[in-house]
């Protein structure tokens, strides 16, 4: 109710930071799980040179336990990456969850509703502990090299957010791909024990 809205406050948190092959990666900290999963996967790739599907699959499997209970299966997630002429950079991910079902006046803005998201809160609206923030796997991320911004990235895609970012970073940093190549390259994703692999160049259609 209104009392809950009045009692809400924005928390500014210190990002997680990790070096990886000459790059410095900043991502979101707990209680969100996405950043932790990404850095855990990159740690497993830190001794690798160029990586392929097998190495990335192993990294995803190592990261997965951190987020198995925190994956969101709904859409309505938007990501923005912004940089200005002074090299100020921002990476912003927002999500509506299942939506609150009401708009704010005539703004067209709908508040989010993560308590209605069954993967995050399987026991229903009123089961979540009071005054405790619900976690998420969204993971806005910044990449720097020699103190200069290289990349701002994040993703929509609910449970595929973390794997998409890991694949992009592995292609960019480990494989030396351009940013365009790193983003558009085929990706791996592991969910519920199933490995999903986008087709590589030259693969034909497989029936059955």
Question: Where do the PLM segments sit?
Answer:
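Accessory "access/gating" subregions that flank catalytic or transport cores
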Residues: 1-31
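Proteins synthesized as precursors that undergo proteolytic processing into mature forms
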Residues: 31-69, 75-208
């Amino acid at each position: 109710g209104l009392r809950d809205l009045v009692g809400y406050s924005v928390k500014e948190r210190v990002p997680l930071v990790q070096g990886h092959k000459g790059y410095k990666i900043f991502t979101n900290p707990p209680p969100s799980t996405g950043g932790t999963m990404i850095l855990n996967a990159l740690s497993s790739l830190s001794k690798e040179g160029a990586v392929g599907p097998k190495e990335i699959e192993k990294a995803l499997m190592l990261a997965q336990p951190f987020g198995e209970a925190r994956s969101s299966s709904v859409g309505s997630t938007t990501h923005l990456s912004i940089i200005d002429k002074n090299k100020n950079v921002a990476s912003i991910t927002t999500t509506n969850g299942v939506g609150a079902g009401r708009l704010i006046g005539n703004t067209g803005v709908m508040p989010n509703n993560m308590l209605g998201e069954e993967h995050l809160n399987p026991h229903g609206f009123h089961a979540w502990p009071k005054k405790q923030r619900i976690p998420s796997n969204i993971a806005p991320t910044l990449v720097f090299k020699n103190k200069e911004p290289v990349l701002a990235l994040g993703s929509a895609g609910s449970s595929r957010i973390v794997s998409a970012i890991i694949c992009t970073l592995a292609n960019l940093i480990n494989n030396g791909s351009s940013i365009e190549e790193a983003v558009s390259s085929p990706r791996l994703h592991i969910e519920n024990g199933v490995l999903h692999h986008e087709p590589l160049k030259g693969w034909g259609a497989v029936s059955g």
